[in-house]
Amino acid sequence: MKSLKKLKELETSDVFNILHVRTILKVIKIDKCISLARHPLVNITVGDDGIWFHLEDGTMINGLEYKTICEKELGFQGFIGIIILDSEDTLQELRLNPFQFKRRLIHMKVDTPEEFMLCGLVFALENLPLKQSTLHKLIAKLVLFPALSPITKILFNTCDTLVCTLRHIFFNEHASEILHKVPLMIRLYNEMKNTHIEVLELYFNTKRSHNFINLSLESRQLQDSSLQVIQLATQFAQTFYSKNGDTSS
């Protein structure tokens, strides 16, 4: 029985090591109008006293206070996110067709201040030009927070992977503890960007300019489709939240 329990724990751990939740957006429902909104973050900094969110209105809050900010927003229903595997983001497209994509969208029922903070951090890591020193300090702070729930585990793993990916592709860090957390597809793409190997260009089916790399999935096209991630996510949200009513409580 003990061996079986350990096996189940290992399987659960493996699942959270290969899955990420990306493109976490706020769901806003006012009357019958449903929309997806980006987080109001313009920067994050890390100090001895915690992780700090710099907001669009010029204020700065401790990341653990972000839950209060979100819950005060009119019509806030929670977050929507996309579950992906390492191999599915090529930095050019998301390797999911529209049918598969719809099955990966989730309504994120987050409860704790830590979970709200992690949702904000995923957005920041995907979208904001963060300093190298901030990335170095961030994970050291995050490991101090207990990952007690499945959603906390997958959010932490997502942040960890994004931090290592940013350190590798933007700051040219190649330490083994960084590289083994960077998805192989992204490592290959970064190699193509630097060396222009024709075989890799054929594999990725692209001859585009490689000067700009963006970790945000919002504008990624889906596989075999002209639809972008944000378009299909918005369609899903409008359908789901219209049928399910208020999900904020």
Curated annotation (Swiss-Prot):
InterPro entries: Herpes_UL7. It is found in: Virion; Virion tegument; Host cytoplasm; Host Golgi apparatus. One of its GO terms (cellular component) is host cell Golgi apparatus. Pfam families: Herpes_UL7. The keyword Protein transport does not apply. Keywords: Host cytoplasm, Host Golgi apparatus, Virion, Virion tegument. Plays a critical role in cytoplasmic virus egress. Participates in the final step of tegumentation and envelope acquisition within the host cytoplasm. Belongs to the herpesviridae cytoplasmic envelopment protein 1 family. This is Cytoplasmic envelopment protein 1. It comes from Human herpesvirus 6A (strain Uganda-1102).
